Amino acid sequence: METTEDVAVHLSERLSVTVAEITVRSLARSLEHWEKSPTKVATVMFKVHPSCVQEKPAGDQWYIPAMGNNRTCRRLILDTHFRGLTPLNDSSHLQTSYDCIAISGLASHPFGSWQPKGDDKEFMWILDKLAHGEQSVRAILFGYDTKLKDSTSFQGIRDLAKHLIDQLQANRGPKCETPLAFLAHSLGGLVVKQALVDLAKNRFDIGYQILRDAIRGAIFFGVPSQGMEVSAWKAIVQGQPNEIMINALSSTSDFIPKLTKAFNETLPEHCRFFWAYETEVTPTAITEPDGQVARKGEAVKLVSEDSATCGFIKSDPGVTIPINKSHSDMVKFCEGSQYYAIVRASLWQVLQPTLLQPDDTDYDAQYLLSRHVESNNRKAFEFITTQHDWWAKSRTP
């Protein structure tokens, strides 16, 4: 399948949905490079639920059998969870290519977290601006499960970081040197920082070294380098196994200071980072009478400017980005957002610092962080349903 039109026709035949009710938003080669017959991954929006979903509406992944006796036709996988790595495009072979990994935050959806709130789900900036607009950048979503209510998971940030490393190593290939950068929101940024620390500590592992050398840096959005306000979340997860995760995010936790210190000490010299911070309060999460979790509680500042910028708002504001949105909304850029151009320019400074900065200026990330440390020593596919549309991811032969 070579075009989005091909995918729409194929899905129509396999799912008994008319082509007019299917919108294929992206098509990319699967990251599973070891396959003899490579598959492709598409992000798709349906105007009506396919019958397989209607039969099992509580699911988040469905298998559609192959058609007849055609051996070239594989079983189709449809999912709305987007867990693991999901490529949104293929980078151009005509120029130097880069990978950009987008990682959402706590209790988030890998795709929906980057979309504006509301019924209109036509726009998602990482797909529609980054993936479709930058031919040399391959945009990839990293999804993981950190739901709050009724969770049975006791995974921690170290576990998530190890899973991120495992996914990147497995899907990029053992000798892949394609430069990569991260767009990371909230908890996602702590996962990236822990992964970088772990890559540095295992310096004798060749695979870890190759991956570490490929990483160019990140743009962090509201990442709590000094902890964050978690009292509302604590009330929701009290007594659950995932309580350990929420406690680790607290401003009184000893985990984050240790992670920040280790990150500062092991940071690769070739990396560069930008730090975005929210400037609006955020409604806290509450449990409603029907048992659903909703952001309808008291509005508070979840992550302070100092915490979100690792202190650079005072020591080097040039690497900080103020975003006049709440903690949740700060990555939900609408179409035409004033912030995309800023993030795009910052991303290219991460990916191509030598092309964008004067040769005689030291923009070394280690230098920036060491200044902050010295200063401190002198005084730290959602199941997206709307009235009209439904998003999903499809793997096609």
Where in the sequence are the language-model features?
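Conserved alpha/beta-hydrolase
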Residues: 131-147
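Short, surface-exposed "cap/lid" segments of acyl-processing enzymes
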Residues: 83-136, 199
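Short coil/turn segments at secondary-structure boundaries
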Residues: 7-10, 55-60, 112-118, 151-156, ...
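Short alpha-helical elements within RNA-binding folds
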Residues: 3-23
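Conserved RNP beta-strands of RNA recognition motif
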Residues: 11, 35-55
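Serine-dependent carboxylesterase/thioesterase catalytic core
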Residues: 104, 158-268
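RNA-recognition motif
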Residues: 19-38
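C-terminal catalytic-base region of ester-bond hydrolases, centering on the histidine
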Residues: 38, 176, 233, 266-397
